[in-house]
Amino acid sequence: QEIVELNSVAKSYGANILIAYNRRFYESTLALKELIEIDGGATSCIFEFTEWSHIIGPLKKGPGVKESWFLANSSHIADLAFHICGYPKDFSAWHGGSLNWHNASERFCGSGITEKDIMFSYHADWSAPGRWGVEVLTRKNRYILKPLEKLQVVRIGSVTVENIEIDDENDLKYKPGIYNQIKAFLECEDTMFCLIEEQLKHIDIYNKIAGYD
């Protein structure tokens, strides 16, 4: 409801509101997108958005924040995967369990196909070990963002995980992604951002993944 009202106010003032998903601007993300294009495009994608319940549970947050934690936090990783491979045009989602700070769901899995005809799947278990990660597959390579700040590759015909060197000086000097994000904002390069009207469409996808009514 808040995003609907915010979008309405923005339109009434002729303003653009950009969602600050900084993972889109990581040097690892930018390098990955270039490599995917060189390979001829992605064929499939896997992502994980496991959260550390033992850390998040005790946190003091405002009303409703932890109860909608997927929207507040985990959507960063879903946005990254879908930014790279396209947003779902058809998918199925399953969720189960509950936590004392997140009643809607505890475990998540799903799969589908994006608007770019790329098959995807995801998984998360908020009561088990894990971390955020994205894997994008092409006909030549499997690219791994895990952690998201680093880019690794498994080449076809191999099982060896190799590190890909990237120029991540600004991501190390500042909070990752922030330098490129602010630069794009100041130079009015909005194409890399998620616009609020786009996010309004994505909310239904995120609610389905998270199990929110």
Task: Describe each region flagged by the PLM.
Residues I3, T29-A31, I56-K60, N103-E106, ...:
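Short aromatic-enriched loop/helix-cap "lid" or pocket-rim segments at secondary-structure transitions
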Residues S12, K183-D213:
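C-terminal helix-rich "cap/oligomerization" subdomain common to oxidoreductases
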Residues R23-S92:
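Predominantly a Rossmann-like dinucleotide-binding segment in NAD(P)-dependent oxidoreductases
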Residues A72, H76-K150, I182-E189:
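Contiguous beta-strand/loop segments that form the cofactor/metal-binding neighborhood of enzyme cores
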Residues L145, D168-K183, C194-E197:
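Active-site loop of classical SDR/Rossmann-like NAD(P)-dependent oxidoreductases
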